[in-house]
Design a protein with these regions (language model features):
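Extended intrinsically disordered, low-complexity coil regions enriched in Ser, Thr, Gly, Ala
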Residues: 14-66, 111-156, 204-246
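A eukaryote-biased signal for long
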Residues: 166-256
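Intrinsic, low-complexity N-terminal interaction/targeting segments
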Residues: 1-20, 76-115, 169-206
Length: 256
């Protein structure tokens, strides 16, 4: 049976300065409570889906957006009145079988987003998030991470929500290409519309001209501030391209 949300609470499990998991506790309409533990990867996947729907709402015309905000605020108020308590013991003695191993967005068509969570013990749970609940849920997740003094982690996660890395590449002196592939599930591909090829032109330590590049999938096709920001953030994501951080580059972007 699908889990619907009446209220949510979050907390971070950490060991020294290392993030272990985020505890997500959900109060359902009949006041039943469900507790899940999510790693960074699963949190990122959840937030990618949530942010994609928020992006759609931000593109509404003024009247429709106002109507959405009014309805959202009523839902947020109700959720704030139904925050479930997370007990310290639930964090100290976290049940590993409640750890989310994978998360998949299976329905993104109507007012609800439906996720299938595969847990550590192999069982599956269906989680339904209404679009009016998205901001409250996302806010609770980021607040918990920031509250655990892990702001850098929050920034790292949120910097990867508006594009999908697919390839990064170095052009070798002999003309060959050395590249890495980032496999992405179909449901993530469906959140983005445009393939962009990015070429970084720079000089190495000896002053010789070099080229590196990437292929990403984005929501925007036209180069602008959003795409420019993505080309910078790709340097932080990619181990291959990290060497370009702080290096003067000419960047070329083309729709594939």
């Amino acid at each position: 049976m699908a889990i619907s949300i009446k209220g949510v609470n979050t907390g971070v499990i950490r060991k020294s300065n290392n993030f272990i998991a985020l505890a997500l506790k959900i109060k359902e309409p009949r006041n039943k409570e469900s507790l899940f533990f999510m790693s960074v990867m699963e949190l990122r996947d959840l937030l990618i889906a949530l942010e994609s729907r928020l992006h759609q709402k931000h593109k509404l015309d003024a009247a429709a957006h106002l109507q959405y905000e009014q309805a959202r605020d009523k839902v947020i108020k109700k959720m704030a009145e139904n925050i479930p308590e997370i007990l310290v013991d639930e964090l100290k003695n976290a049940d590993i079988n409640r750890r989310v191993n994978t998360l998949e967005l299976t329905d993104n068509q109507g007012e609800n987003l439906t996720f299938v969570l595969t847990l550590h013990d192999g069982s599956k749970c269906e989680l339904v998030v209404n679009e009016l609940q998205i901001e409250m849920l996302a806010r609770a997740i980021i607040h918990a991470i920031n509250n655990a003094e892990m702001r850098e982690l929050a920034l790292r996660i949120t910097s990867l929500l508006d594009f999908l890395p697919l390839y990064d590449v170095d052009c070798q002196d002999n003309g060959n290409l050395e590249y890495d592939t980032y496999s992405q599930p179909e449901w993530k591909h469906n959140l983005f519309d445009h393939y962009l090829a990015v070429l970084y032109r720079f000089k190495d330590e000896s002053g010789k001209e070099q080229f590196s590049g990437a292929v990403v999938k984005t929501r925007e096709a036209t180069p602008g501030k959003e795409i420019e920001a993505i080309t910078r953030r790709m340097l932080d994501f990619s181990p291959r391209l990290k060497k370009l951080a702080g290096v003067p580059c000419q960047v070329y972007v083309r729709t594939v």
